[in-house]
Regions:
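Metal-cofactor-binding active-site regions of metalloenzymes
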Residues: 23-521
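Positively charged n-region of N-terminal signal peptides that target proteins for export
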Residues: 1-5
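Bacterial N-terminal signal peptides
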Residues: 7-17
Length: 521
């Protein structure tokens, strides 16, 4: 059977450099020392962290990760119209209305204004909050992201950018068969206290399986289109072909409850049927009136469906709120409910932990259950205005909660994942060891199938089958090689360790500190 380019190749971790890699604590110490000597210099810090292997980006929305310039280019190719008055992109060619200009004929000033409209660039001139600017951007580029062939082009942009930052794996949020599933859900009779089991069975009896098959065909088509665009089977594949990709099926939390339930049920069924879909998530503003009204109901929906399909992984946006954006009462329980009621394996953002009724206990529970916090520093600053000392990142670390850094919507925020590592290091004074742990955590808490390479990830202690091997070695022992072949996650973790060995052996980190003798430096 032909292997999908978007699935992890089990042997990828073993086809590395032919050079023998040896454990070298001295290399690690030397690299850490170079980092400490230069981390107060932003250009050098960026160069270091751009080169540093970063296992995965686990919290990324496909459409929001694409840069605005790409959308404008694709709009021009499709002869779409830009309304320069409303600053929107139309899903068709221009008519005779005021301010309508073909995307292919936009002047530099109009194009710059559209980039600002589709991103957080020049937010101080937008005349609106970061929250509104951010979430409204999706409606502007929506007509372009839906064009034929563009999902593959979007994925190509993301995977190639990831490869350029030494990222090995992406878990991307997308919506498959969204409209059809919502229409099916709209036929559900909904009551104040719904019988979730009965309604789940109704969905199964009325076409959910057929929509799952349609969704799998959509993924097949995307897979094929992406592979062709990237030349993944050619002699000169694009760099992104080496990045493994998995999908998280989205549910829009602002829809009516019957549609949300149908989308959630569909996400569970799709994840069971297709190994490319490794879990689910809820998206759209958590502060939306419907999302607030139905929050606990939605957690109960997920909890019920998870009991029917416990093998499906759950990542949830929870606690992406701040005092003033919503009344205090809505800050009291969202993270705890996501962990306890819904059974989330990862929590995205988790910003309002300080306002939770049982914040200390919730962090202890996350540590106990191994529920990772997906920290999106730039996004939290832009949308919520939470930054620096106000952000709970140091508190999660102090509480022993597993933490990963993520980009969220790098196109809208005008960043990349390396930027988030730079921001974490420069804002919180983190050392190389902690940043390396973030990188390892991103694969440890990924939803890739299989057991972990680590018996104890925090202590970098490998499983018994590989205990006599150097993690990342090009030729693992037979027992270790068999272990790696049996676990996609362990195979990717092995590849990350090999990348760290190469990174830490760079002669750059052996050189003296780069210090200018110039005045004031």
């Amino acid at each position: 059977m032909k292997t999908s380019p978007l699935t992890l190749l089990l042997g990828a971790a073993l086809t590395l450099s032919g050079a023998s890699l040896q454990a070298a604590p001295a290399d690690t110490a030397r690299t850490a020392a170079w980092f400490e000597a230069h981390k107060d210099r932003p250009p050098l810090l960026r160069q270091f962290l751009q080169r540093m292997p970063k296992g995965a980006d686990l919290h990324s929305h496909v459409s929001g990760a694409v840069y605005a310039e790409s959308y404008l280019g694709w709009a021009a190719q499709a002869d779409l119209c830009v309304d320069t008055v409303r600053k929107s992109i139309q899903g068709q060619s221009c008519g005779t209305g005021e301010g309508q200009v073909p995307a292919s004929k936009l002047g530099s000033a109009a194009a710059a204004a559209m980039v600002d409209r589709m991103s957080m660039r020049n937010l101080d001139q937008a005349g609106r909050s970061g929250h509104d600017q951010f979430f409204d951007a999706f409606s502007v580029f929506g007509p372009v992201s839906d064009l034929p062939g563009k999902p593959a082009a979007m994925l190509a942009e993301l995977s190639n950018r990831a490869a350029g930052q030494q990222i090995l794996h992406l878990e991307l949020m997308t919506t498959v068969q969204g409209g059809a599933v919502r229409r099916l859900g709209g036929q559900l009779a909904w009551a104040a206290e719904p019988d979730l089991a009965r309604r789940h069975q109704w969905l199964l009896d009325h076409g959910l399986a057929a929509l799952v098959e349609a969704g799998r065909h959509d993924l097949d088509a995307l897979d094929q289109d992406y592979r062709q665009q990237q030349g993944c089977d050619s002699a000169r594949p694009q760099p992104g072909c080496g990045v493994s990709v998995r999908w998280l099926q989205q549910t829009t939390r602002t829809n009516p409850p019957e549609q949300v339930y149908a989308q959630l049920a569909y996400a569970f069924e799709l994840a069971k049927a297709d190994r490319r879909v490794v879990g689910l998530n809820l998206v759209a503003p958590e502060d939306h009136p419907v999302a607030l009204r139905d929050y606990r109901l939605q957690m109960e929906m997920i909890g019920f469906l998870s009991k029917q399909s416990p093998q499906v992984k759950i990542a949830l946006h929870a606690g992406e709120l701040v005092l003033g954006l919503v009344p205090p009462e809505h800050l009291r329980h969202h993270i705890r409910d996501a962990v306890e009621l819904a059974g989330a394996h990862r929590i995205g953002h988790a910003v309002d932990i300080g306002f939770e009724n049982d914040g200390f206990e919730t962090m202890a529970l996350m540590k106990q259950r191994g529920v990772a916090a997906e920290i999106c520093l730039t996004s939290n600053d832009g949308i919520l205005g939470v930054r620096g000392r106000e952000h709970p990142l140091p508190d999660y670390l102090a509480a022993g909660v597993p933490v990963v850094l993520a980009s969220d919507d790098e196109g809208i925020s005008r960043i990349d994942l390396s930027h988030e590592y730079v921001r974490a290091a420069s804002t919180y004074g983190l050392g190389y060891a902690q940043l390396k742990q973030f990188s390892r955590n991103s694969l440890e808490y990924s939803f890739l199938p299989g057991t972990s390479l680590w018996q104890d990830a925090a202590q970098a202690r490998v499983v018994s089958a590989c205990r006599r091997d150097v993690p990342g070695a090009a030729q693992p022992s037979p027992a270790c090689a068999a272990w790696l072949q049996g676990s996609e996650r362990a195979g990717r973790q092995w590849a990350l360790e090999a990348a760290f060995e190469r990174f830490e052996q760079s002669p750059q980190w052996r050189r003296p500190a780069l210090r200018s003798r110039g005045r004031g430096l």
